[in-house]
């Protein structure tokens, strides 16, 4: 709006209708199959949200870790390299970007969502899906179920920004609402795992660098509060290093 005696100049940019249309088509959500929804920035894959149950047939049927849902994988770097892993042999239960706790207390009983043996996350409904010239967004409602009884409402919101020359920002917002009874969440004692987690894809161990606010580190740092942590390596034989923080 016009201002009287403005103290500074303002600049505006006008775009043709065709340019605006091209920007609006920057992102695209596409169904991969009946369990997975993928996001592309133009022709570059960005990530996949697995809303249905993903099953690894190579894991014995008696092992409850052979199936999981409600997580993000793969996540691609800016050069097409895959940054995340799923069903790694050393920890079958790890799955891309996920959120889980080894100690979930309900009605005096403890469940392990980290290993998902007596409690699991399941898709309930879509809340929102959109694309735009700057970012794309997705919102979904899941449930935590003990057998067939839902004990928790889980709402996941993703906002994925268009890539810059050397980075991409992905915002993840998580909300939990107990259905009836109080629920307690606790991580693993003396090990620090539990909560929002990312399982990185295999990279060059010799070239892997972990950086925290105090600088580079080679320590595990259990039970250490960190505002952020960065892992950088050369994934899958890529020509250059990349990573995430």
Predicted regions and their residues:
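Low-complexity, Gly/Pro
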Residues: 1-20, 126-131, 160-166, 173-180, ...
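Acidic, contiguous internal or C-terminal segments within carbohydrate-active enzymes
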Residues: 26-32, 130-132, 136-189
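Acidic (Asp/Glu-rich), glycine- and aromatic
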Residues: 49-55, 60-74, 163-211
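Active-site/ligand-binding surface loops and adjacent short beta/alpha elements
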Residues: 182, 188-245
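Alpha-mannosidase-like glycoside hydrolase catalytic domains involved in N-glycan trimming
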Residues: 1-26, 49-141
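Residues within well-ordered beta-strands of beta-sheet-rich folds
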Residues: 11-15, 40, 139-141, 171-177, ...
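Mature N-terminal segment immediately following signal peptide/propeptide cleavage
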Residues: 33-50
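A short, structured loop/turn motif at beta-sheet edges
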Residues: 5, 42-44, 128-136, 163-166, ...
């Amino acid at each position: 709006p016009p201002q009287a005696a403005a103290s500074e100049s303002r600049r505006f940019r006008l775009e043709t209708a065709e340019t605006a249309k091209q920007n609006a088509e920057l992102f695209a959500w596409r169904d991969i199959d009946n369990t997975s929804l993928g996001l592309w920035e133009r022709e570059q894959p960005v990530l996949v949200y697995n809303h249905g149950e993903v099953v690894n047939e190579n894991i014995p049927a008696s092992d409850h870790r052979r199936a999981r849902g409600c997580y993000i994988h793969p996540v691609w770097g800016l050069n097409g390299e895959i940054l995340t892993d799923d069903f790694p042999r050393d920890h079958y239960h790890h799955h891309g970007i996920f959120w889980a706790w080894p100690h979930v207390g309900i009605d005096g009983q403890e469940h392990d969502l980290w290993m998902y043996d007596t409690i699991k996350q399941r898709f309930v409904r879509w809340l929102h899906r959109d694309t735009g010239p700057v970012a794309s967004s997705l919102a979904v409602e899941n449930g935590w179920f003990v057998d067939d009884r839902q004990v928790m409402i889980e709402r996941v919101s993703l906002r994925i920004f268009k890539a810059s020359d050397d980075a991409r920002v992905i915002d993840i917002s998580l909300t939990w609402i107990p259905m009836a009874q109080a629920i307690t969440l606790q991580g693993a004692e003396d090990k620090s795992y539990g909560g929002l987690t990312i399982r990185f894809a295999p990279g060059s161990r010799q070239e892997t660098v972990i950086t925290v606010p105090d600088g580079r580190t080679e320590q595990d740092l259990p039970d250490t509060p960190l505002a952020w942590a960065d892992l950088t390596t050369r994934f899958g034989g890529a020509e250059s290093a990349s990573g995430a923080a």
